[in-house]
């Protein structure tokens, strides 16, 4: 090569063919470098997308080691919670029945303390649910010793008066046939049904007559016969009666009822002014065909005994 050419091209052709020597590294590094260079020479493989399955949720068994956190499952849309219905404002029928049994027992204890001694009368008073015969708004007062309104200017008698009148009518006997004048709501007839074989009851106010039927129906009392009619006339077709109980006050006891009383029978009725003043619970016993004996007992207050029907 001429000097002028050497100046223009300082490197000879031999110098270009000869590759520069690289510094040698460790064996592992040399192998990695070779592998890397080979991988770089190959075209990259096209990867297909793979669907990733959600990891199954595992529940750790009691006492086992804590599991590794798993991939959260696919979220599920939550349904809006439906509001629960409001609890009823009154106690269920079953619970109230248990409560009424307890208060009935306490009512019977008061009756016994007040002088009612006949065990059959006390059992009958305990057996009949008085709260079923009053308006729902008065149910909490059903076992208090008080008269309660039942509509149409009528009342349900106090438990103490009901027990007293039935005990007087029984006089320790087993009653076969009883007549009640003034059915009202049906409570006293229900009590009588526990101490007599057959109970006949008359009501002159049609709505009360219908109400008594409804009140007695759930109790399925087989020995009560209700009649719509004039109580002062009685029920001659079913006479004579071992006992007659009148649940309204008249100035006297109607003669028709005295005639329907069996010999040896007993009639119990309030007698006195219809205003309620000076009413006295009266016992009438039929001692012979044309003879009756009268006893005046306790001061009471009843609605008036009226004739006719409405």
UniProtKB/Swiss-Prot annotation:
GO terms for biological process: methylation; protein modification process; protein repair. It is found in: Cytoplasm. It is an enzyme of class 2 (transferase). InterPro entries: PCMT (IPR000682), SAM-dependent_MTases_sf (IPR029063). Residues 14-32 have a biased composition (Basic and acidic residues). Its EC number is 2.1.1.77. One of its GO terms (molecular function) is protein-L-isoaspartate (D-aspartate) O-methyltransferase activity. Residues 64-81 have a biased composition (Low complexity). The active site is at residue 157. Catalyzes the methyl esterification of L-isoaspartyl residues in peptides and proteins that result from spontaneous decomposition of normal L-aspartyl and L-asparaginyl residues. It plays a role in the repair and/or degradation of damaged proteins. PANTHER family: PROTEIN-L-ISOASPARTATE O-METHYLTRANSFERASE, PROTEIN-L-ISOASPARTATE(D-ASPARTATE) O-METHYLTRANSFERASE. This is Protein-L-isoaspartate O-methyltransferase. It comes from Burkholderia lata (strain ATCC 17760 / DSM 23089 / LMG 22485 / NCIMB 9086 / R18194 / 383).
């Amino acid at each position: 090569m001429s000097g002028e050419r050497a100046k223009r091209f300082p490197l000879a052709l031999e110098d270009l063919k000869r590759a520069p020597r690289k510094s040698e590294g460790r064996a592992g590094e040399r192998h990695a470098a070779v592998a890397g260079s080979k991988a770089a020479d190959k075209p990259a493989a096209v990867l297909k997308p793979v669907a990733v399955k959600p990891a199954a949720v595992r529940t750790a068994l009691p006492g086992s080691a804590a599991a590794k956190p798993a991939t959260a499952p696919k979220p599920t849309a939550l349904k809006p919670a439906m509001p629960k219905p409001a609890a009823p404002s009154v106690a269920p029928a079953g619970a109230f029945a248990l409560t009424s049994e307890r208060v009935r027992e306490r009512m019977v204890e008061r009756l016994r303390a007040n002088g009612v001694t006949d065990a059959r009368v006390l059992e009958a008073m305990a057996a009949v649910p008085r709260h079923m015969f009053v308006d729902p708004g008065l149910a909490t007062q059903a076992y208090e010793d008080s008269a309660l309104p039942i509509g149409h200017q009528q009342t349900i008698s106090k438990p103490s008066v009901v027990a007293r009148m039935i005990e007087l009518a029984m006089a320790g006997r087993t009653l076969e046939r009883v007549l009640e004048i003034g059915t009202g709501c049906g409570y006293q007839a229900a009590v009588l049904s526990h101490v007599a074989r057959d109970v006949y009851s008359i009501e002159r106010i049609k709505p009360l007559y219908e109400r008594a039927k409804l009140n007695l129906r759930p109790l399925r009392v087989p020995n009560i016969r209700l009649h719509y009619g004039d109580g002062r006339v009685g029920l001659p077709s079913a006479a004579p009666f071992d006992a007659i109980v009148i649940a309204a006050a008249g100035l006297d006891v109607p003669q028709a009822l005295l005639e329907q009383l069996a010999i040896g029978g007993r009639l119990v009725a309030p007698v006195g002014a219809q205003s309620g003043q000076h009413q006295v619970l009266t016992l009438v016993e039929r001692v012979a065909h044309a003879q009756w004996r009268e006893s005046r007992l306790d001061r009471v207050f009843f609605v008036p005994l009226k004739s006719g029907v409405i």
